[in-house]
Amino acid sequence: MKNLTRRNFNTLMAKGMGSAAIMAVTPMACAMGTGQDKKKLGIALVGLGSYSTYQLAPALQDTQHCYLAGIVTGTPEKEKIWADKYNIPKKNIYNYQNFDDIAKNDDIDVVYVVLPNSMHAEFCIRAAKAGKHVICEKPMAVSVEECDAIIDACNKAGVKLGIGYRLQSEPYTNEVKRFVRENTFGKIRYVSADAGYYSGGNPDQWRLNKELSGGGALLNMGVYAIQSTIYGSGQNPISVTAQEYSTRPEYFKDTDETITAQFEFPNGAVGNIMTSHNINANSMYVSAETGWFQLQPANNYGPLSGKTSKGDVIEFPHESQQKLQMDDFSKHVLFDAPNIAPGEMGKRDMIICAAIYESIAKGGQKVMLNLEPGYGFGGIPTS
């Protein structure tokens, strides 16, 4: 079988060969590389698309607690390019067929899955079975059931699991969390968040293919807006009502283009989100009893910007969000620091996404949510 890539993944699945052929490699059990005796953890990037190429790999040149140790790619031409650029030894380069052999490699402590959404669960589970800690890029999966499977696999293997929520580590977001946690502006009454961009590129890109992406704007950018309303209110929502809009059906053939949703929170606060692959949007706003605060931009790669009703400008030195994120996860593994973006957070957000889709399918009816408390400010439960 040819090496698996984003380009031939659909073909394999259509022939009924995808998961069966990929999983034909016998899983190997080995002792987990804990990294406890290392100064830095070795990270292997699984999938060398634009995010790995332009964000993660450069960030790993500046991280303090981890480094780029290996790669997994289905494109042979990329192997030499990456090996030469980042001095990656041949023994640390894998494809999707021999991926399970990574279990034997003590150079690699963490596997970062950066594949199309529908492939997250499979490779996170395989990484856990190989005894490697796991970072799963957002969204965690394409269903709540897949989230559960990933969490269970990591728990059984005794490995750590984190979700690639870069904003949870960056200072502007953490300042918003502080405002809410310390009641700087009193009780939160309203929060809104927008996250989107205009997609006008290749109509065959995997994000526009539901078989690969699992959804459209909601699973891609919408998770940022959902997270903003949660840490902006300090609570998980108790209900959601949602609507979908399509103005370019010829382009967005089987994925959602634009979605709006309204949340209710336990303390009486309300929230609104808008997410789109057709509208440029990048902000969050919180109104409280004695004032307001906002970030705009709020969810791009930075630098971000913010201000408050007191006239204060929210400003921090710019650092790579990906660098901060991967260092935070590495500190969790190495020093048992809090896991600020655990698998449970990824699952929570997938439950909310599923409820949004359910509301849309029911013509905008309210859908009640029964979420476990916590994960409102980060990995440390709030209640």
Where are these predicted regions, by residue range?
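NAD(P)-binding Rossmann-fold cofactor-contacting core
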Residues: H65-Y86
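Predominantly a Rossmann-like dinucleotide-binding segment in NAD(P)-dependent oxidoreductases
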Residues: L167-F252, G363
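NAD(P)-dinucleotide binding in Rossmann-like oxidoreductases
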Residues: E250-D256, E264-D327, P342, I356, ...
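C-terminal helical cap and adjacent loop that interface with cofactors, partners, or active-site loops
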Residues: G16, D312-S383
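C-terminal segment of N-terminal export signals and the immediately downstream linker at the start
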Residues: A24-D62
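N-terminal secretory signal peptides and thylakoid transit peptides that target proteins
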Residues: M1-A20
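Rossmann-fold dehydrogenase core element
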Residues: A149-R166, R189
